A protein has these predicted regions:
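N-terminal export signals
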Residues: 5-25
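C-terminal helical cap and adjacent loop that interface with cofactors, partners, or active-site loops
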Residues: 9-13, 47, 240-247, 253, ...
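C-terminal segment of N-terminal export signals and the immediately downstream linker at the start
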Residues: 19-56
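NAD(P)-binding Rossmann-fold cofactor-contacting core
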Residues: 57-82
Length: 423
């Protein structure tokens, strides 16, 4: 995959749209329910699926997870969600657990849409099964954790049917304040952009313990701190801010140099707890990014600052979204005061500037299924994932890494266990 070929492919699909005649091509009656199957019943998966049920015409009809205890908790939760919305409880035949649960879910004729919220290592495998089965897919980020998986995801994207919608969980783009300032920035409100600063600072997720679990099960239940399962914090969590930078600049970086390590965290896992990355974009635009994920003080701060020849912009998760300079502008809608707005939400349910991000993205996605045009966001998801891998590789190897070097020599990861033991 040469750089120019990648850019051409990514640019064509980054908008996530295939222009088709609506309604007739999509086969859904107005206001009919889209039947959603949740694959991965953890905190984030449950939160997003609940939001789908509450904010769209989607109904949760099926659940799948590796572990039966997770499945049981999710079933109880969604029984209440469905009852509150006047929907039917989930049928016994649509509850799947074990290492083949994803295949059983994909094969079900009772499911239209699969939400993939499993550990990132499995995203490509689960994408492959869902897309091949003709399902619509909402896949959490990242679409892959290494270069080989990124290539696989790009190929899967080419096999998505014209009436099939596939979204990647970059909901920040759908937050109203961020979408509004993005339009200004892309329209030249900052002049020539010279430098960008970004951050993602959060406290650490608690270690998940489970009775009688062995080493492999402990890894899976704490996948967020496992390098092979998550891709490390830069690829799994910090990806939101890096995606915003790629989106606002309309490009991916050409090279990166980075440092980082694991200085504070003591629980199981091999992910780093901090990164400092200097990305260089076309036109010698620099993006300095820093992240931390440790501590128990519930601090959370994330966002971008962009500096141009005629203006500067702040694009935070929490705080004023504004431009200063010749084309001064500020997001005016009041988002209220919430004492929890500066706290990290492990399930991604943030307040303030991202308050409407999940519901708005979900509504747009469901509309693409019922009315069209269909989405195909896999190429854009691949480009952002590779950008994060570029920074990760530069940090691990302690040297400058180019985009071409990443594609030729990027790390690959193996799971190091068999899931058949959980059958």
């Amino acid at each position: 995959m040469k750089r120019r070929e990648f850019i051409a492919t990514g640019t064509a699909a980054a908008a996530g749209l295939l222009l088709l005649k609506p309604r007739a091509a999509f086969g859904y009656q107005a206001n009919s329910a889209v039947r959603l199957g949740l694959l991965g019943c953890g905190s984030r998966g449950t939160s997003v699926a609940t939001s789908f049920a509450k904010n769209t015409s989607a109904q949760i009809v099926a659940l799948a997870d590796l572990f039966p205890d997770r499945l049981a908790v999710a079933r109880e939760h969604f029984s209440q969600v469905n009852a509150s919305g006047g929907a039917q409880p989930i049928a016994e035949k649509l509850l799947f657990h074990g290492p083949r649960a994803f295949e059983q879910l994909a094969a079900s004729q009772d499911v239209d849409l699969i939400q993939i919220s499993t550990p990132p290592f499995f995203h490509v495998q689960h994408l492959e099964a869902a897309v091949a089965a003709g399902k619509h897919v909402y896949c959490e980020k990242p679409v892959g954790i290494d270069v080989d998986q990124a290539r696989q995801a790009l190929e899967i994207g080419k096999r998505v049917k014209p009436t099939q919608s596939v979204d990647v969980g970059f909901q920040c783009r759908n937050a109203a304040p961020i979408a509004a300032i993005a339009e200004k920035i892309k329209g030249g409100a900052l002049g020539k952009i010279g430098t960008v600063f970004g951050s993602y600072n959060a406290s650490a997720a608690e270690e998940n313990t489970h009775p009688a679990s062995g080493a492999d099960e402990h890894r899976l239940r704490n996948w967020v701190w496992d390098r092979a399962l998550s891709g490390d914090i830069l690829v799994e969590q910090n990806i939101h801010i890096i995606d915003l930078c790629n989106w606002l600049l309309g490009a991916h970086p050409l090279k990166a140099i980075a440092t980082g390590g694991r200085n504070i965290l003591t629980h199981a896992g091999d992910c780093w707890d901090h990164y400092e990355v200097d990305f260089t974009y076309p036109g010698d635009v620099r993006f300095a990014f820093a992240s931390t994920q440790f501590g128990e003080y519930e601090m959370f701060e994330a966002g971008l600052k962009l500096f141009g020849s005629t203006g500067a912009a702040t694009v935070p998760y929490v705080g004023p979204v504004q431009i200063r300079g010749k084309q001064a502008w500020a997001w005016q809608e009041s988002l209220g005061t919430d004492p929890n707005s500066g706290k990290f939400a492990a399930n991604g349910a943030f307040t303030y500037n991202l308050a409407s991000a999940d519901p708005d993205k979900e509504r747009t996605f469901i509309d693409s299924i019922t009315s069209g045009p269909a989405h195909n966001q896999l190429a854009a998801g691949v480009e952002t994932a590779l950008t994060c891998m570029l920074g990760r590789m530069a940090g691990y190897q302690g040297r400058e890494v180019t985009w071409e070097d990443l594609l030729a020599h990027g790390e690959t990861y193996k799971l190091g266990m068999t899931l058949d033991q959980f059958a």
